[in-house]
């Protein structure tokens, strides 16, 4: 393509060249012959800056750039306006019990409620002061009768020393306060009691005593004379409930107690004379209640 243009330019320019073999005269007018263009020269130095052109039209917005790095935390701003109340959320899990709050103000007095059920009995109170003497009471001396009496014998001879003698033959036992298995009388009612014994002896001396809670109250000694004899004793004792009374041999080898049910008996007896009046009063008060 470039060669074709070059040949065409050359033909055009050749037709316009002046003829050199023609003589120059007075009426000479030159005819130019177009030359062939040379190779491009080197670029010239940059020209001076022109004056700024008018502002162009605003271009279209560019695409959003990538997010920058997170900046440092700024200072706390001022509180904004309170927003509207949002919808009620779901119930959360039950939290730990908080500390007891301060006592609130006393509320208005409520209406009187109904009478509640009777509560359990309270503890026994302290003893009050003694009151004034009351009116004379009604005699109930014959309404309460407490009985305690016994009479027992023995069917064996020569018992062991310093042990309760077992009187195993029961003749009378009001209230069952004498125990024929142990030989002991056990007090049931506080009061004054009368005790007695009549012991037949033979072949040995006899040293016998009446014992109250481990202490001798009376002692009786009877010597063997070669014949049957009887040793006796009696006394009055104040007893408390659970006190014990029995007979025993108090000296070694002097246990001449003799028993022959078909011929002679050895007896141990006792009975209540009267009950302690304070005890009777307490029983009377319980009956009234």
Swiss-Prot record:
GO MF, one example: identical protein binding
Collagen-like domain sequence ranges: 38-139
Coiled-coil stretches: none
Protein's cellular compartments: Secreted
Ranges for domain C1q: 143-279
Any single GO CC term annotated in Swiss-Prot or TrEMBL for this entry: extracellular space
Signal sequence interval, chain numbering: 1-16
Biased composition (Basic and acidic residues): 63-76, 93-102
Name of this chain's protein: Complement C1q tumor necrosis factor-related protein 7
The organism of origin for this protein: Homo sapiens (Human)
